[in-house]
Swiss-Prot record:
Superkingdom of this protein's organism: Bacteria
UniProt entry keywords in alphabetical sequence: Ribonucleoprotein, Ribosomal protein, RNA-binding, rRNA-binding
PROSITE patterns: RIBOSOMAL_S19
Task performed by this protein: Protein S19 forms a complex with S13 that binds strongly to the 16S ribosomal RNA.
Family named by the database record: Belongs to the universal ribosomal protein uS19 family.
Pfam family of the protein (one): Ribosomal_S19
Protein name as it appears in the record: Small ribosomal subunit protein uS19
Length: 92
């Protein structure tokens, strides 16, 4: 069930303050964050966020197709190493 429209999108206040400060200065430094739950707003376009995946910070460059999604969607937490080969040779 999606979030109610009357509430608006959720963004951590400290993250929004950092983006606004960089927009005023005109800088585009990497913003390190642990806030995977924050929604990407149109103000974030062109910025790079270092989103924590539980082990390290993954750089995520924001473009217009990402608006409305969560930051955590672009920093996977699990590494997929592939399926085990289903081979009868290994069972002998």
């Amino acid at each position: 069930m999606p979030r109610s429209l009357k509430k608006g999108p959720f963004v951590d206040e400290h993250l929004l303050n950092k983006v606004d400060a960089q927009n005023e200065k005109g800088t585009k430094q990497v913003i390190k964050t642990w806030s995977r739950r924050s929604t990407i707003l149109p103000d974030f376009i062109g910025h790079t966020f270092a989103v924590h995946d539980g082990r390290k910070h993954v750089p995520v460059f924001i473009d217009d197709s990402m608006v409305g999604h969560k930051l955590g969607e672009f920093a996977p937490t699990k590494t997929f190493k592939g399926h085990v080969k289903d081979d009868m040779k290994g069972r002998r």
